[in-house]
């Protein structure tokens, strides 16, 4: 048992790193934006490239691990993750950084599925296995919670590059720990990798993300965006058709007929999408507008992280006693309430204590949902399909992160552009100055998107009060976009909570080995 606990610790260290990188970079976005002259679209890709590659091949990597050996694939993935971290840490520009993040996502996708599969192999007793899976689920929530705090401390002490050197050091430590403590396991009867399904699914997801992000500059009516949306639709249809007829599908779509499988998968998607609104845009706004340091942002997010951890621990106990239905519903309610309370508090001159407390309430809600959502999906399938189920819910989470990077980003900057006119019109300046400012609107938006506001303010400091008013108008428009993202996120989380209340049973469901869907 002691050896099993040591191996579990090694596996959870690797899991922690792969999930940490969903949020740890968010606090460093303002710093790297200034350093690399990156646009907001490029920042979206810094986040989205990791989530996209993670989500696109996670299920396939799980199948490869089952066939070739889970430990081998995990170690290979950890090595790729470390290589991507080095590429990011040394990146001279935004495109190289985005490429490095994509490489890290590939490594994470190869590493993560095996962590759960090996746990099922190590712990043969039902009770011990359940406890180990509970630890596994809690660690993923812990990583999500601590990301902004760790990122803020690293950025404050060094720079955004410190985040990736941190990844390298702990990635190598996790690789060595897994190599030494985790036994090899494989399934000699495992199905061959569904290459066609992987291609169709990954292609559809990538085309959709490219389309939405490209629409921010080209518009949804542009030929390029329409073509990408068409490609995404065709590939998605091909994926569904292939998976229905494949002998060993990448994702058994029959399970989506079960509300208790589909419901928590949708909740996972919505909560990760909404989490992106907090970690990406709040951190970016605080860096760019009040010009907070990494340490200050870490302090703002610290109460949220603590409440996420407490919520996750409490949810494990609550779910064990009452099932996943009400913990998920309550968690979504707390998450949405935190978003709605925090929204008006995000201003150019924020009151940090109320903002931190509102984000802490949202964090408690996020923490409460993590464990029961995973438990609900695992309860909906027989034990031999738990690996697929866990990978499916994690894929839903990563797709939510991809959607957050693309959809919310498009919303924020379309709203910024739409409201900037009204804010400029409200300025108390001569009509001629207003006309000049309106003519410079594209430049103002570009300055906000590239984090160069202070640079341009200094350049035109001789304009006195006029430039100060322009600054206020620009930041107010940016705030309008951020608020729109928060309101949309809160609405999605509320709908997810209602869905959980309807689809999840009142008590923990047993493994559905006799379910007709599995025939």
Please report, for each region that a protein language model flagged, where it lies by residue.
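Transmembrane-helix exit segments and adjacent C-terminal regions of multi-pass membrane proteins
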Residues: 1-11, 15, 375, 438-519
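Transmembrane-helix bundle of Major Facilitator Superfamily
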Residues: 1-180, 315-316, 322-324, 343, ...
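Transmembrane core module of solute transporters
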Residues: 7-53, 159, 196, 224-228, ...
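C-terminal module of multi-pass small-molecule transporters
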Residues: 8-10, 57, 69-78, 94-99, ...
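Small-residue-mediated transmembrane helix hinge/kink sites in multi-pass secondary transporters
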Residues: 30, 62-63, 151-152, 209, ...
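Generic alpha-helical transmembrane segments of integral inner-membrane proteins
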Residues: 52, 56, 79, 83-87, ...
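Helix-loop junctions at the membrane-solvent interface of multi-pass transporters
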Residues: 61, 83-91, 157-158, 180-184, ...
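Hydrophobic transmembrane-helix bundles of small-molecule transporters
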Residues: 134, 156-268, 274, 292-295, ...
